[in-house]
């Protein structure tokens, strides 16, 4: 699964790509960082795989009415990266590096960088990802995510209890990153509070009352939330993306 790794094939000083690491097959989501339309992706085949056999297997399950719009967007994006990929992702890295430095200069935020690489718990770092710790501002990452979306018209990728992730890709410009930095500065000025008010991030060991397989195949019914006390939820509840 190389959903977030399209740029590894074109960028310089990037983490090793799945195919370079020896994968037989890699699913690459071009729409995430390669510029194609949402839902479009490639399946890359390594030298040990019979491409015609892979195609035959895929034809057993996929629709015979594929979206030509998605396929054309894949081909256009593929050509664009083949001709200009290194230049494009060099610019993406420059933009992300600029934003990371500006955010860290604001105070209270921490935009993660390659300084975390230690050869052990952190093996490598994707410099195109702009991950920002928000706890010292006294705000959870999901709170900053919501504020950016609702009041600054900036949609980021993800927010959790302590972090915010901005996905910088082929479509971003310098002014987009400047807007993000300015918005974070304004959020710090207007909303900063004592981080002691944040919810404590304690791990609560869950009580397993049904395994995933049992829950999936069990009979289910839809109920209003107020009537579900004491019942077992048959769906997954998780931070998303990535939903793993």
Each model region followed by its residue ranges:
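Non-catalytic terminal extensions of PLP-dependent enzymes
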Residues: 100-105, 110-244
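Conserved PLP-enzyme active-site core in the AAT-like
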Residues: 1-116
